[in-house]
A protein has these predicted regions:
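N-terminal "arm"/small-domain region of PLP-dependent enzymes with the aminotransferase-like
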Residues: 1-47, 375-376
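PLP-dependent aminotransferase class I/II
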Residues: 11, 55-59, 67-68, 120, ...
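Phosphate-binding glycine-rich loop
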Residues: 47-94, 108-110, 118-120, 142-152, ...
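Conserved PLP-anchoring active-site segment centered on the Schiff-base-forming lysine
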Residues: 81-137, 161
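Helix C-cap/helix->beta junction micro-motif
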Residues: 112, 181-182, 336
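Active-site phosphate-binding strand-loop segment of PLP-dependent enzymes
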Residues: 124-222, 227-229, 234, 374
């Protein structure tokens, strides 16, 4: 086919008519009731933690993700850390997570005092490979006094954290099956997957717990924010308590029963989030339309994900031949004002995680990270804005 960089430029500058100016990778679209809701916060001075918009945002997320409980936090990293802590993860534990993910996944594990154990990826989904998880648990872990431990480190295996990469759902059925055999809880890192569905069910609500991110570059933003999702009432209570300074006093008393965190989302941010969630169906329709046009345009090098999943098309991706072609593509597109990016570095290659345990060579993840590029994916691209 034609040089992918040229093909992308012709599509964006030609077909979509974006003749001048930079084209962002993914930018927020502030529309709908955003100004009215934020102004309401300013007019009433309900700008900090607490407030009707926080409660409303939690309710909206619970409905969208088909869970009973949602707890708002200040960002996705704190949401993941709190969800893990709510499940009892802490020092002396290890948590399985993909090597191909954003660094916050591993950082949140470390913030609990636990150690990440990096697992390989699956080519079809880009996410955690359930068979790699099964292999780690069966061949590199054993039960000692009824506790599942990683043999090489002696750490208790406490949880598994898959991440839905770029909004593409992981093979959750197989992963749930593998983890159920070892009674291991799963916390979905759905930071990039609001609106994605796996076999018709919303991502973030498929396991013991899930988390969302509302960073400025996500499909829906609060400026900065996160959400913990669960159907477990006790877990919801624990994480809400933990993220609100563990306060037990009422009224004017200030009693606290453990070392808690001030992870509360401000009402001002939640107001923006409520307006954004009202627009989610439109955002999804436009982004999926764009993804289909990219798929038709790029053919076999476009990353489609699994047939079992319906991505929110947060960040569209191409899978090029090798690192040389990737770097050439990135240089050519960015030089012409079209923002593209590679995937992250493998987290296991970062200096602070160089000695962390892993499932093996991470061959698939390493191959993917050398070939993936993300291309402009904003919903506005098809809205004439």
């Amino acid at each position: 086919m034609t040089n992918p960089a040229v093909t992308l430029e012709m599509f964006l500058r030609g077909k979509l008519g974006i003749a001048q100016g930079p084209i962002a990778l993914h930018e927020p679209w502030i529309t709908g009731n955003a100004w009215a809701y934020v102004k309401d916060c300013l007019d009433t001075a309900w700008v900090s933690t607490g407030g009707a918009y926080v409660t409303r945002l939690e309710s909206m997320c619970a409905d969208i993700c088909n869970v009973a409980f949602a707890v708002a936090t200040v960002n996705g990293t704190t949401a993941l850390r709190a969800a893990l802590q709510g499940l009892g993860v802490g020092p002396g534990d290890t948590v399985l997570c993909p090597a191909l993910t954003f660094v916050a996944t591993a950082n949140a594990i470390v913030h609990t005092g636990a150690v990440p154990l990096f697992v390989d990826s699956e080519l079809g989904t880009l996410g955690m490979d359930p068979e790699a998880v099964s292999d780690v648990l069966s061949s590199r872990c054993n039960f000692a006094d009824g506790v599942l431990r990683h043999a090489a480190t002696g750490l208790r295996v406490a949880a598994v954290v898959p991440m839905h990469v770029f909004g593409n759902p992981v093979d959750m059925d197989r992963l749930l099956e593998v983890c159920a055999a070892y009674d291991l809880p799963i916390v979905e890192d759905a930071a990039e997957a609001l609106g994605s569905r796996y076999k018709g069910f919303p991502c973030g609500g498929l396991a013991k717990a899930g988390i969302l991110s509302f960073n400025g570059n996500k499909i829906v933003t609060t400026g900065g924010g996160g959400m913990i999702l669960t159907n477990d009432a006790e877990l919801a209570h624990r994480v809400r308590h933990l993220t609100t300074t563990a306060r037990v006093g009422k009224g004017w008393t200030f009693d606290h029963d453990q070392v808690g965190y001030n992870d509360r989302m401000p009402n001002l941010n939640a107001a923006l989030g409520c307006a954004q969630l009202e627009e989610l169906p439109r955002f999804l329709a436009l982004k999926r339309n764009l993804a289909q046009q990219y798929a038709d345009l790029f053919g076999s090098i476009f990353v489609r994900g699994s047939n079992a999943g319906e991505s929110n098309a947060w960040l569209n991706a191409l899978l090029l031949n090798d690192a040389t072609e990737r770097d050439s593509f990135l240089e050519d597109t960015n030089a012409k004002g079209i923002q593209t990016r590679p995937a992250w570095r493998l987290i296991s290659d970062l200096p602070m995680y160089a000695t962390a345990p892993r499932s093996g060579s991470l061959a698939v993840a390493r191959d993917l990270v050398e070939r993936i590029v993300n291309i402009p994916s904003s919903a506005q691209l098809l809205a004439g804005l």
